[in-house]
């Protein structure tokens, strides 16, 4: 299979679909790596992470991180087996990278601010793309943000735009792509 991109709205069932899809690809000798990109910074996010972990049970090896993937996954790469990996999710990864840029005034961001974030986000997305070939199968999950209203504030518009561009980048190189709506996956590539 190679690289598979799974997108959909919030609570659309995309993670559950991606998890089941990847488990079905395991040849019996592979590890199922779950690269969790969320940072649990409040109670709601902690509960969401706990729910995901409970659903995965012991079928997965969870690795947490949203950047510097060669370093984050170095222990996985020491194994000669071409394992499978699920990245959940690209939009969380992007938001974490954006919020590392503490010196940006998001009420009045400049073009330089956007360029700075673009460089940081693209660097990490490219690093993620570069490690894909070290796995048998990789599924990248991301939120589809471009179907709603135009955000009324600069940070919201920027996030929607950069996430959309990175979704396009992954979808373009993916071997397959799925759009999940109300728990129903539709193959779009």
Question: Where in this protein do the model-derived segments appear?
Answer:
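Residues at the starts of beta-strands that form the adenosine-phosphate
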Residues: 30-33, 83, 137, 176
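Residue-level signal for inorganic ion chemistry
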Residues: 18, 52, 86, 143, ...
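Short, glycine/serine-rich, charged loops/turns that create anion-binding
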Residues: 10-11, 39, 91, 145-146, ...
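N-terminal/domain-start segments enriched in small and hydrophobic, helix-friendly residues
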Residues: 1-3, 80-82, 136
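Conserved P-loop
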Residues: 2-77
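Conserved inter-motif catalytic segment of the P-loop NTP-binding fold
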Residues: 43-127
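Structural motif
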Residues: 5, 84-86, 139-141
